Amino acid sequence: MKQHRICATDIILLVINVLFLLGMLFWFGPCDHVKEDGSFMNCHWAGVVLAGTAAVMTVISLAHLLIPDTGMKAGLSAALVPCSVFAFLVPGNLISLCMMNTMRCRSVMTPAAMVCSALVVITAAVDIAVQLRRKAK
């Protein structure tokens, strides 16, 4: 029986996604402005969607770390790509944000989501290549 080896990309994917999740919950989220009628602004919902997407990506990354099968790891990395693209498109494209560029949703949340998403896509692509190369051996 083969021993389960943890690859560097396993850890990198998990760290990026945990930081993405914690960032959206505590550091990178939108401001707490509420409309005059008491309802939340659109940027609040963009932050909620990003936190939820980051949570799903974190669970996928944790499964990626724990599962020893290389084919399954490649599939989990492939599943991270559309999640990351979705997270990249949410702020400002799928959910509109505040109009002022100086607001927290545009100046902090959007760049953080884009950077984290791009890092996950790059790392997942590298991991897919690594896992498929291992499977071919």
Model-identified regions with their sequence ranges:
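Transmembrane helix-loop junctions in multipass membrane proteins, especially transporters and channels
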Residues: 29-33, 66-73, 96-100, 132-136
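Hydrophobic alpha-helical transmembrane segments
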Residues: 49-64, 117-122
